[in-house]
Amino acid sequence: MYAVFQSGGKQHRVSEGQVVRLEKLEIATGEKVEFDSVLMVVNGEDVKIGAPVVAGAKVVAEVVAQGRGDKVKIVKFRRRKHSRKQQGHRQWFTEVKITGIQA
């Protein structure tokens, strides 16, 4: 059984027991969170597709960790001008463990 849900403007395909990195959520570590914007639920041959969401379906998860991702370097290089600009960015994330899919 797996489900596709939306969080932080992105869609995630998850199954029970899986650990997923999402955009930062303002929830403390160890707390439970429910995602009710479930777009699709597949249970064997039974496929439920929402228009746009599946009514009554939700994905239940537990927050495992909060953190920042690896550094991404942004470089602007101007040829023949002896000029360049360098910048770095680390995106915040929330790691959740999927504990249940209800449809």
Swiss-Prot record:
SUPFAM superfamilies: L21p-like. GO terms for biological process: translation. Keywords: Ribonucleoprotein, Ribosomal protein, RNA-binding, rRNA-binding. It comes from the Bacteria. PROSITE patterns: RIBOSOMAL_L21. One of its GO terms (molecular function) is structural constituent of ribosome. Coiled coil: none annotated. One of its GO terms (cellular component) is cytoplasm. InterPro entries: bL21-like (IPR028909), bL21-like_sf (IPR036164), Ribosomal_bL21 (IPR001787), Ribosomal_bL21_CS (IPR018258). Belongs to the bacterial ribosomal protein bL21 family. This protein binds to 23S rRNA in the presence of protein L20. HAMAP family: Ribosomal_bL21. Part of the 50S ribosomal subunit. Contacts protein L20. This is Large ribosomal subunit protein bL21. It comes from Actinobacillus pleuropneumoniae serotype 5b (strain L20).
